Regions:
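A short glycine-rich, Lys/Arg-flanked "PGG" loop and its adjoining helix->strand segment in the class I
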Residues: 141-156
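Short, glycine-/aromatic-enriched active-site segment of Class I SAM-dependent methyltransferases
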Residues: 162-181
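Short alpha-helix
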Residues: 183-198
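Conserved Class I S-adenosyl-L-methionine
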Residues: 203-267
Length: 267
């Protein structure tokens, strides 16, 4: 299944632009992260892994792609003391990030509104990270090539990547597109792409169970807050949210979708 670039971009912006509504807040941010905004499977666990994998400290500079509302940038800057840049394409998301973190520059992190396939940084970084962004990149290989170029020699890439299990169906793929606007490669193809651009030694951990757990939490919270959510978004939108979480829970539980945490270094 393939989709043209304009359709992909429009679909993804539709998803991201509503990521501060009560469904996300009451069923993801609050029950999973105590109100902090992490909108990918990696969450703060990916950031802690990155800190240990890289040995992050004040002497380092870090770059997040798809920085959303900025909470991950704040987490990395405050926990590890390094300088952080977050790049985000969505106008609404970058405005939310700046509203949430008005003192970011004094705390060591900044936000840039840009398309990561067109933007060029003015410096090289010690680490680049993102959660689930390869799945939504219009050209995975080009993005990986750019990231490799943006890293200093020995710099690290740490990501979570959602890939297709061997038994995924076209019906499953159609659901993923309708829900979130992305296509996914098989695991072997995704890892080969990462290696092909120059990242040879990959530290790969299967965290698919996290996808199951997250969607179970979404379902429990959706029913617990049903009255509030129906009042906020309507019964049809509430039901669609619940059905989406059920379907994603199934896809992860049956390993039609697989989630990987990956760390690697540029030579």
């Amino acid at each position: 299944m393939g989709h043209d670039a304009v359709a992909v971009r429009e679909k993804q912006l539709q998803v991201w632009d509503v990521s501060d509504d009560p469904r996300w807040r009451l069923t993801i941010y609050e029950p999973l992260y105590g109100g902090k905004i992490f909108a990918n499977i990696g969450g703060p666990a990916l950031l802690d892994y990155m800190g240990a994998y890289v040995g992050l400290g004040p002497e380092h500079s870090a770059l997040e792609l798809g920085s959303g509302m900025g909470d991950a940038c704040e987490y990395v800057a405050s926990h590890f003391g390094c300088r952080v840049t977050g790049v985000e394409m969505s106008t609404q998301q970058i405005e939310r990030a700046r509203d949430r973190h008005p003192d970011s520059s004094s705390r060591g992190f900044e936000f840039v509104q840009a398309d990561m396939l067109q933007w060029e940084p003015s410096e090289r970084y010690d680490v680049v990270w993102f959660g689930d962004m390869l799945a939504v990149a219009q050209d995975r290989r080009v993005l990986l090539e750019r990231v490799h170029r943006w890293l200093r020699p020995g710099g690290a890439l740490t990501i979570t990547d959602i890939v297709a299990g061997p038994d995924i169906s076209e019906k499953d793929r159609a659901f993923i597109w309708d829900a979130d606007g992305f296509d996914i490669p098989f695991q072997a193809d995704s890892l080969a792409q990462i290696r092909d651009v120059g990242f040879q030694e990959l530290d790969v951990t299967d965290i698919t169970q996290t996808g199951v757990t997250i969607n179970e939490t979404i379902l429990e919270a959706s029913y617990r807050h049903k009255t509030t959510l129906v009042e906020a978004v309507g019964a049809d939108e509430w039901l669609a949210w619940v059905e989406g979480a059920k379907e994603y829970r199934r896809l992860f539980a049956e390993r039609k979708l697989v989630c990987l945490r990956i760390g690697t270094h540029r030579a």
